[in-house]
Amino acid sequence: VESYKGMHFACFDPDAPSLEEYLGDFRWYLDVILDNDEGGIEFIDGNIKSRLKCNWKFPAENFVGDSYHAPWTHSSALIAMFGKQPTMRPDRSYHANANGHGWEFGLDFIGNAATLNSPQILEYLREHEAKFAERLGKVASLSSANVFPNLSFLAGHNTFRTWNPKGPRETELHTWVFLNANAPEELKKEYRRGVMLTFSPAGVFEMDDGENFENCTAVNAGVVTRRQKLHAGMGLDSRIEHEELKGNVHQSQINEANQRAFYQRWADLMNAETWADVPVR
């Protein structure tokens, strides 16, 4: 059992690498949400458990690289909340991955926190933007991430979840809400309410995603589909070098670089006899 910035991780394999080695460069990205304030984080009371008729890899894949599904999957909810679709900027957004862990993000500090529909939350973020930037650096945005294999974050919503397999076609989802420990009590209520609105079993976005996860699992179980190869080639030539960002960095959120890295890591582990056989990517 080891911990990182207030989160505890456990593994039954005595030969597994240390948590520091396992996370690798991805620790830099986790600090954006776990260590942007000197007081650290705390969990808001309660968690949500629900089940989906899907393979666990579908939701994990969605969080490792989230943005290109959003404009049509969540179109009705986004228009209802904002009156229009948000604008995406490929030139100001990225995919980044390390050993199958993935983070996708843009340079808008508010990011997807805007969907929480809370003026108090937006005011808090704007007031603290300079402080967070001083602590972490300017490139510290709010979007989605997945720690391989099945721990996902929505940083702007301050929620994280685990996708627990209950067989090849069923997943149990556990969801928590967290916040900086120094944040006002009223703000904690706002985040809880915002997550219930957006990413709970009855939330306006979670219901959309659940339809995708379940229907993709069902369709891909078909005989004809299983005979074919699926294409995940978006952004094949998008790799860049970035002076601030860690790991394997790709230009644009509209990408499948992180999805490819996720499945490569899964294949590496499935094919390896021991941890020594698992390559560092």
What does each of the following model-derived ranges do?
Residues 3-281:
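C-terminal catalytic domain of Rieske-type non-heme iron oxygenases
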